[in-house]
């Protein structure tokens, strides 16, 4: 008899998402852009996803959560707050339209810092962590060809400008099959002299 690993106590898996979260006023502005896109192009993902900058996505056993939290806390303690500049729109042909992030390097450097924890985030060979190397803020994804073509024709000419200070990151999770994420923990960037060298992190 096959054993469903989801039914074993302590072996439940979650989908995790690590993000930068803009301040509330900016989130509301971006949600307005997403709603306007939905009103015209009827793309469900435009209103389904919240305005945030994804850093890492991964699937892992819930029993690993505490170790992952401790590792991310160490990285955040040693990282500095930084400015995130948003400017106009970009796209991933032929499925996604997003707001451009022009200050990519501090985000890429942060993601690189967290790669030292990738063993903790790897469930198995089929479920490896995905580190986002092209930071962006999604307006709509999984677009149909007509939605992308017509939407990009309009949004490639539109303008948007904003900035926010990233002073923390959020770890979110959801059960397989659930749509909504819940907050696991907020990690503040404290710019402290923390030892986070590779080889010392696989405790």
Go through each PLM region and give its residues:
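Basic, often amphipathic N-terminal segments
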Residues: 1-83, 106-163, 180-203
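Short, basic/glycine-rich phosphate-binding loops at helix/coil junctions
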Residues: 90-96
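Short histidine-centered catalytic/ligand-binding loop motif
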Residues: 97-103
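Residue-level signal for short segments within beta-strands and strand-turn junctions
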Residues: 173-175
């Amino acid at each position: 008899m096959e054993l469903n690993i989801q039914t074993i106590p302590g072996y439940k898996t979650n989908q995790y998402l690590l993000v930068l979260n803009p301040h509330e006023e900016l989130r509301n502005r971006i949600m307005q852009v997403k709603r306007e896109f939905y009103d015209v192009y009827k793309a469900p993902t435009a209103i389904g996803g919240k305005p945030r900058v994804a850093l890492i996505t991964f699937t892992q056993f819930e029993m690993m959560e505490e170790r992952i939290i401790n590792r991310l806390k160490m990285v955040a303690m040693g990282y500095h707050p930084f400015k995130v500049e948003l400017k106009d729109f970009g796209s991933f042909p032929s499925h996604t339209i997003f707001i451009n992030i022009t200050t990519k390097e501090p985000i890429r450097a942060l993601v690189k810092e967290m790669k030292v924890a990738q063993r903790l985030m790897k469930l198995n060979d089929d479920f490896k962590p995905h580190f986002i190397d092209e930071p962006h803020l999604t307006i709509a994804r999984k677009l149909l060809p007509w939605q992308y073509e017509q939407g990009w024709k309009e949004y490639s000419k539109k303008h948007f400008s904003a900035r926010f200070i990233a002073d923390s990151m959020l770890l979110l999770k959801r059960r397989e099959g659930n749509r909504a994420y819940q907050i696991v923990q907020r990690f503040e960037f404290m710019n402290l002299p923390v030892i986070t060298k590779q080889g010392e992190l696989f405790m």
